[in-house]
């Protein structure tokens, strides 16, 4: 597998991470370097680790996991998105927005955006491709795309001066990404 093919694969895998990062950036009123690093690092790390897991597992379990990976991503994204939408309608001012760069939400988003990378790992094993270069490129591209997505999403928030609507829109975007994943797997 040549470098340009690996790079195109990495960019394709990073699109979901980019879209989720835009939604997260849109939700976060204060985007610090620490938050950018945390989300970018986790998305890049998960995007890099999932192909390794798939590659190590090999072809034996491909048919079992491929049949359900898109459903897992869809459920995780819809669950997080629905919670964000519900929280956007909470009128109590003392209820803080949940930070997508911390805790369980960070891990769930990282998992949801990296499910396709698991299947790529299975494919790389089936093709008998070395895993090292693809994993490094996939991880770095996901990290960079997440970083850019956070900055773009936050810039859109700053330019519009919106409040709770940002969380509503971010939740809607996550649900749409989940629906897109199902559509890509020909569920409907």
Curated annotation (Swiss-Prot):
GO terms for cellular component: plasma membrane. Its main location: membrane. It is a multi-pass membrane protein. The chain crosses the membrane at residues 6-26, 36-56, 60-80, 106-126, 131-151, 168-188. The keyword Membrane applies. It comes from the Bacteria. Belongs to the MntP (TC 9.B.29) family. This is Putative manganese efflux pump MntP. It comes from Desulforapulum autotrophicum (strain ATCC 43914 / DSM 3382 / VKM B-1955 / HRM2) (Desulfobacterium autotrophicum).
């Amino acid at each position: 597998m040549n470098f340009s093919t690996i790079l195109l694969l990495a960019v394709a895998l990073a699109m979901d991470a980019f879209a989720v990062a835009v939604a997260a950036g849109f939700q976060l009123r204060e985007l610090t370097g620490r938050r950018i690093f945390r989300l970018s690092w986790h998305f890049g790390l998960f995007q890099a680790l999932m192909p390794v897991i798939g590659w190590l597992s090999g072809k034996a379990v491909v048919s079992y996991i491929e049949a359900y990976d898109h459903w897992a991503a869809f459920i995780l994204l819809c669950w997080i998105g629905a919670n964000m939408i519900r929280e956007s309608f909470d009128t109590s001012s003392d209820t803080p927005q949940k930070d997508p760069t911390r805790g369980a939400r960070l891990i769930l988003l990282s998992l949801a955006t990296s499910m396709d990378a698991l299947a790529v790992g299975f494919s790389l094993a089936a093709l008998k491709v070395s895993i090292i270069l693809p994993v490094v490129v996939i991880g770095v591209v996901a990290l960079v795309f997440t970083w850019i997505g956070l900055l773009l999403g936050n810039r859109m928030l700053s330019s519009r001066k919106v409040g709770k609507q940002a969380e509503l829109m971010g939740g809607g975007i996550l649900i749409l990404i989940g629906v897109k994943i199902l559509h890509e797997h020909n569920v409907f």
